[in-house]
């Protein structure tokens, strides 16, 4: 049963929320904007309401497997199974099987959902940092990177020991930086696109 639950976690993560919203609006988001199937590209291309919808949907792809699959599989929540379900959901989001393993998002929203289930207080800290930086600078990528830095720090302060959750948060943070490597280059060059506030178009 745990093996089946692992597969379910990956399949849930693979649901291409941004792709489906784009298709519902008559476009393939892989061919417009940044080409990324994430909430930021939806925000820039279709506006803040579809962008918010995709962000919440992608976050739930991480939250629900961690919350529900341990009960389904008859295993303990948290470490190691809850974490494994969450990591596979993130992997599915970045490399979705329904799109043949290509064209996924960068994992930020899904990772947020994972840590909402595993560590709510660090989640709030990281999300707060993301929102503040993104609103002030209008760079969603910079907000994601700052949030990724804050997450393991907040987990360390919560755990007060080198627990598996600390290690996982560090790995997730490093993974977010890896998926944003092109954004980092554009930020350094001053070529990164800004997001728009609600009521505006990118």
Where are these regions (language model features)?
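Short, non-helical or kinked segments that cap or interrupt transmembrane helices
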Residues: 28-39, 99-112, 139-147
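Loop-to-transmembrane alpha-helix initiation sites
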Residues: 124-126, 140-148, 161-172
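C-terminal ends of transmembrane helices
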Residues: 18, 23, 90-101, 130-137, ...
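Interfacial segments of multi-pass membrane proteins
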Residues: 43-47, 69-73, 92, 106-137, ...
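Nucleotide and nucleotide-moiety/phosphate-recognizing core
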Residues: 5, 50-56, 60-99, 118-125, ...
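Cytosolic, membrane-interface loops and tails of multi-pass inner-membrane proteins
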Residues: 21-49, 103-104, 183-202
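N-terminal signal-anchor transmembrane alpha helix
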Residues: 1-24
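Alpha-helical transmembrane segments of multi-pass membrane proteins
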Residues: 9-14, 70, 88-93, 130-134, ...
């Amino acid at each position: 049963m745990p093996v089946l639950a692992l597969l379910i976690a990956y399949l849930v993560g693979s649901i291409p929320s941004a792709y489906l919203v784009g298709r519902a609006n008559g476009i393939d988001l892989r061919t417009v904007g940044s080409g990324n199937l994430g909430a930021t590209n939806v925000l820039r291309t279709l506006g803040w309401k579809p962008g918010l919808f995709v962000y919440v949907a992608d976050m739930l792809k991480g939250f629900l497997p961690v919350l529900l699959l341990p009960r389904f599989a008859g295993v303990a929540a948290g470490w190691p199974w809850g974490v494994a379900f969450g990591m596979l959901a993130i992997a599915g989001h970045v490399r979705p099987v329904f799109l043949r393993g290509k064209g996924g998002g960068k994992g930020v929203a899904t990772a947020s959902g994972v840590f909402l289930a595993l560590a709510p207080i660090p989640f709030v800290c990281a999300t707060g940092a993301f929102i503040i930086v993104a609103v002030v600078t209008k760079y969603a990528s910079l907000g994601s990177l700052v949030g990724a830095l804050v997450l393991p720090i907040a987990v360390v302060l919560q755990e007060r020991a080198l627990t598996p959750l600390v290690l996982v948060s560090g790995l997730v943070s490093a993974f977010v930086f890896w998926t944003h490597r092109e954004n980092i280059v554009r930020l350094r060059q001053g070529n990164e696109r800004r997001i728009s506030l609600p009521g505006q178009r990118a």
